[in-house]
Amino acid sequence: LWPAGRMPDRQPNQNYEPYLVWYIPEKPTTKAIQVIVAGGGYGFCNYVGEAEPVAYYLNQKGMTAVAVKYRCPRPQNGPKHLSAWQDAQRAIRKVRAEAPARGLDPNRIGIMGFSAGGHLTLMAATNAKTPAYAPVDEIDKLPCTLQWACPIYPAYALTDGADRPNTT
């Protein structure tokens, strides 16, 4: 997802590199792309339980899906979603950059996510013009705007972002 040595805000407790997995349908019915972000409370990424099954389902319907394996666990001493938000913005830009070579429409990209991924979906959709990180290469000149968003049981959305019920 990131060029070597250029990933922003790397944390020592984050145990893997973020990456994308493209799911290409055998019989495409659209040139649109669905980006998928799994949940896991920003403590882990439930990729196998949430992103993968949805990607396979969309492929059966003829739609290309791209699953994002974002950084976990959450950063130490910072906002729980920061690393994941950076990875989501970068993922959208990477998908947009690669779409034409794959015969897909770079202006028809949506995002969906579950739980913490639903929160990340809302962050990506409503903060596309707010950079989550400083540009690292040419890809970051591309917009990370989206054409649709599907937050599915988004965590933290109706609270102050705390891990416990909102008391304010």
List each model region and its residues:
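Extracellular/periplasmic catalytic domains that process cell-envelope and extracellular macromolecules
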Residues: 14, 27-29, 60, 104, ...
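Catalytic nucleophile-loop/oxyanion-hole region of alpha/beta-hydrolase
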Residues: 46-48, 53-55, 68-106
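A fold-wide structural signal in alpha/beta-hydrolase
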Residues: 33, 59-69, 110, 148
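Short beta-strand element of the alpha/beta-hydrolase
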Residues: 30-40
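N-terminal cap/lid segment of alpha/beta-hydrolase-fold proteins
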Residues: 1-32, 157-164
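Primarily recognizes the serine-hydrolase "nucleophile elbow" in alpha/beta-hydrolase
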Residues: 90-167
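Alpha/beta-hydrolase active-site loop signature
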Residues: 41, 70-74, 156-157
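Serine-hydrolase catalytic-loop signature spanning alpha/beta hydrolases and amidase-signature enzymes
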Residues: 41-43, 65
